Amino acid sequence: TQGVSSAASDVYKRQDWHYLWQPLARHHQVIACDMLGFGDSAKPLEHDYSLLEQADLQQALLAHLGIAEPVHLLAHDYGDSVAQELLARHYEERIDIASCVFLNGGLFPETHRPVLTQKLLLSPLGWMLGRTFSRQGLAKSFRQIFGPQNRPSESVLDDFWSLVQSNDGPRILHKLIGYIPERRARRERWVSAMQRGEVPLRVIDGALDPISGAHMVERYRQLIPRADTVLLPSIGHYPQIEAPLAVLKHYLEFRDNLLSPSSRLACS
């Protein structure tokens, strides 16, 4: 079967996809990596982190694994932007994308509402905040962006924090946050790619996410022709953790629909 390439790596990537990995792997070949600067990957301090470089690395991984067939992208958060760049490259015939599903993420700079920690990391003093960032700070941030009925357990927070800490991660948080202005600079390219309509797209979004929740989906419906969206009403920023069964259901439904003749005709 065609591969599912997860372009969804972010600071907490591995824990993000823990609940979906085995169910997806039963149906598809699943490929994912910790992106540069995230999880257990290298986190060089003297490095300019770029979404374009992250897309390059995803393509390099596919080439290394000998994956030549079209890939299906499943992305979240930071990974949404990487997936948008890969989608734009599809239309430049630099990669073959079969479909793309976005979970909560900043698809449009005008609807992205950064939390206080992100704003501070973007400031000239961001490097100081990164070096003092703690598990307590992580827990506070997560409680703001999870749905009120789906607060993360202490065990989940421990797992997330271990990935942030890996390879001295807090010292580069101010470097990684550069994706926010980079999104603004590449908005036209990425939104235009989503509007082309030749690659099937779906958004599965936790509506209560204060960063990229229902307000982002409303904008998506305004800008994207024949918008295919699923709003999860009581869910926050991490639907794959807060409601993994719902995400799996809506993702597999999307993939099944791609096999129908009417779906192929609509996207041809």
Where are these regions (language model features)?
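Flexible "cap/lid" subdomain of the alpha/beta-hydrolase fold that forms the substrate-access gate
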Residues: 10, 15-16, 31, 38-74, ...
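Alpha/beta-hydrolase-fold serine-hydrolase catalytic core, especially in secreted/extracellular enzymes
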Residues: 259-268
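Conserved catalytic core of two-component sensor histidine kinases
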Residues: 5, 18, 25, 248
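Single conserved hydrophobic/aromatic residue that forms the stacking wall/gate
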Residues: 1-8, 12
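Catalytic histidine-centered segment of alpha/beta-hydrolase-like enzymes
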Residues: 232-248
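A short, Lys/Arg-enriched amphipathic alpha-helix followed by its capping loop at the start of a domain
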Residues: 19-28, 64
